[in-house]
Amino acid sequence: MLEKTYDAKTVEPKIAKVWEEADAFRAGAGAEEGAEAFTIVIPPPNVTGSLHMGHALNNTLQDILVRFERMRGKNVLWQPGMDHAGIATQMVVERQLMEKQIHRRDLTREQFIEKVWEWKAESGGTIFNQLKRLGASADWSRERFTMDEGLSKAVLEVFVTLYKEGLIYKDKRLVNWDPRLLTAISDLEVEQHEVNGNLWHFRYPLEGETFDPENPKTFITVATTRPETMLGDTAVAVHPDDERYRHLVGKNVVLPIVGRKIPVVADEYSDPEKGSGAVKITPAHDFNDFEVGKRHKLPAINILTVEAAIKLKDNEDFLAGLDATPERQAVWDELDGLDRFVARKKIVELMEEGGFLEKVEPHRHAVPHGDRGGVPIEPFLTEQWYANAAELAKPAIASVREGRTNFVPKNWEKTYFDWMENIQPWCISRQLWWGHQIPAWYGPDGRVFVEKTEEEALSAAIEYYLALEGPWKAWVEDRLENFQPGEILTRDEDVLDTWFSSALWPFSTLGWPDQTPELKTYYQTDVLVTGFDIIFFWVARMMMMGLHFMDEEPFHTVYVHALVRDKNGAKMSKSKGNVIDPLDLIDEYGADALRFTLTVMAAQGRDVKLDPARIAGYRNFGTKLWNATRFAEMNEVARNDDFWLNDAKLAVNRWILTELTRAARQITDGITSYRFNEAAGAAYRFVWNLFCDWYLELLKPVFMGTDEAAKAESRACVAFVLDEIYKLLHPMMPFMTEELWAQTAGEGKERESLLCHAAWPSPDFEDDEAAADINWLVDLVSGIRSVRSEMNVPPAAIAPLVVVGANGVTRERLVRQDSAIKRLARVGDISLADAAPKGSAQIVLNEATICLPLGSLIDLAAEAARLQKELAKVTEEIARLHKKLSNERFVASAPAEIVEAEREKLAEYRDAQDKLAVALTRVRDAG
């Protein structure tokens, strides 16, 4: 006998242990002979990470697909693994070392990396245990890590191959530079922070004019939020159609403080409507300016150190062509070495003293910050390794255009194309110690040798230098003669961008570059489930690498899920204090309740607004199923292997089997089309509404009656439907359903398999007549209950029922279902009439009008007054909200989640208004 209540805290670890001991999720477990493969690779969470709501949604949806296809008999692999998370992991270990007063630079690179591996062994990967608590059914025996031996081998193979194909190269370009972490970072690691700053308007004197701050003809005004970068200005840009400046194009201005003569160039980047219409161009310190600089062949002058301090001394690019007068030199010396923000204040002072500061305006604007270092990043000109993304992107664009890979929802394809068709070279190097060290070695003259191993690089270098004539040949020969070959090459210290190894994930985890059986079986993978924020950083790059090295797309479908927000629609963040920890929710409500809630709310293209109250509600759904199973047990329901669907004779049983067939199709269609919310909704409606509320209720007289054949049939039918329910719900609610499956095997019996390996339901039973008959009864009783509720009829009151205009079918149903109608709708005599009695509330069902004479049961006038008062109150609220939402200022300035919440309130009030109006009309008509 089942326990009285379901205890998730007891059942979930028990079931997890059962799965683990049975090795239930290994690749191919439960598959039919020669089954088609189904593969998903997990988006590898950071080794430093812990489970957040985004992970919970992402992995719940993956697990639904995986469990569903496993039950459909496919050869399933859900490949788990973790990302080495270069910057994040290095920071964690550095912080730990600093607690012991040890700086990273106090250690050798090898010693530090050893510390990182020690940390991973002790603390890394806690997220996998958390995912297991969620119920994730990955093949945990195949766990991979982007720095493990096999994946490192794949990374070397890819880098060396792309380099030798000319698709990886070194270049000097602008990067996002984190001056705290001292490394280039990706766009994904940059956060935009709104800050209250200033817009400084500077006067740049025209060459050949005597500068007069009172005479606009002697200068051109530019505005900037970053005065410190003016030291690296190499042009002023104006729009080619701007009549105010057309006569100045081609002329020079003299850069204050510096004395550099820089040209006025015509470029569409300048906006005539913004500020003065003229903008300073600093190619070495602004991404847009860098592009302007390329178009006009302007020099790029870097005036910052890697720590973002001013660097003027010995800066050849800065000093080139300048007249270093004693006055200027003194100013430069004063600025040299200053922190960028200290220098900003000093430069503004100097500009003001020289009459070059026209005005200062308060200006709120976005400043990019490193998400790990937490300081403003610098667009920084530095030599880095790059991949030719434009070339690699071409096949990846074609794959989506030609439908070999599809995005769901389809609108994300536009985002993909926008990114891919405007792609820039991919900066793949990082100035870190933790990561895949770039397999490049430099000879004594700076020549690069790229090979998989140092031995191969040294061999290539020796061959190259010994074929030369001159000093380098002699130098190398000397090292070889003195047994010092190790001095010939110096390895590049940089590591690869974490996304580089992640881009190989779908095939490297299967053993590539070796042609393993797993690679042949499970590549290409079927679907990638991911958030929209990494479509470019990860999805696009997997497409590039998969097509280049496997000559096949890594997946045929990319399902892009939405964000999980708080109940008000606000993005979760620690600063707002609205972060919800999924483990807390699992502790309180159970994993199944959390999973089902996320599934119900996972509508395509709509963010999930997570309210813990909803999770409590869906926990009640699990309780409902548990109690339904207990009810079945108490009524001696047991599995009967001899039960055949077509043998069912009772209309109520034939009805539930028909509805089961329909629900199974809806759930299957929902999952296969990635409409998870529709699948969950269909399951909820069938289990709660049809099975529990109606079917079991309609069976009570059967179980209490004396017809043994009807009892036996109904018991077998209930057992069959419950088994199908467990299967249909299993992908969404795996723990409870697996427990119920085991507990209902029958006395002294065991199931043939775990539920996770049971065959997916495909019932094929349709009895339209029985379905129409019972659904008519459900609609009739529901309509009567609705009227009673709307009109405040006391629950115990028995009302007569009068039916007007009934045809032969309805009359026959009224007779056949007489006892059920009276019991479920709480009505007395049922009669037919030609007209509705006075004082009756009416509903229309098919051709008939159903009348409830209520005049003797309620005070119709008082009820009308109550409804009128409620309707007036709701109408007043609608007017207030409509006025608020018609205020353009409110809509534009209020946080988006507040506006959305008000819109939802308005929709709720309008719905209430409609219902109250219907109820009021009914009362008045009855009176």
From Swiss-Prot:
Protein name: Valine--tRNA ligase
Subcellular location(s) per record: Cytoplasm
Gene Ontology annotations of biological process type: valyl-tRNA aminoacylation
Ranges spanned by the short sequence motif 'KMSKS' region, renumbered to the chain: 571-575
Superkingdom: Bacteria
CDD domains per UniProt: Anticodon_Ia_Val, ValRS_core
Any one GO CC term of the record: cytosol
Function, as annotated: Catalyzes the attachment of valine to tRNA(Val). As ValRS can inadvertently accommodate and process structurally similar amino acids such as threonine, to avoid such errors, it has a 'posttransfer' editing activity that hydrolyzes mischarged Thr-tRNA(Val) in a tRNA-dependent manner.
GO molecular function, one term: valine-tRNA ligase activity
Keywords noted in UniProt: Aminoacyl-tRNA synthetase, ATP-binding, Coiled coil, Cytoplasm, Ligase, Nucleotide-binding, Protein biosynthesis
Domain notes: ValRS has two distinct active sites: one for aminoacylation and one for editing. The misactivated threonine is translocated from the active site to the editing site.
Enzyme class: ligase
Residues that hold ATP according to the record: K574
Pfam families: Anticodon_1, tRNA-synt_1, Val_tRNA-synt_C
Segments carrying motif 'HIGH' region: 45-55
Sequence similarity: Belongs to the class-I aminoacyl-tRNA synthetase family. ValS type 1 subfamily.
Enzymatic reactions: tRNA(Val) + L-valine + ATP = L-valyl-tRNA(Val) + AMP + diphosphate
TM stretches of this protein: none
Entries under NCBIfam families matching the protein: PRK05729.1 (NF004349), valS (TIGR00422)
Keyword Flavoprotein applies: no
First-listed, main subcellular location of the protein, grouped into a coarse class: cytoplasm
Coiled coil: 856-917
Quaternary structure and partners: Monomer.
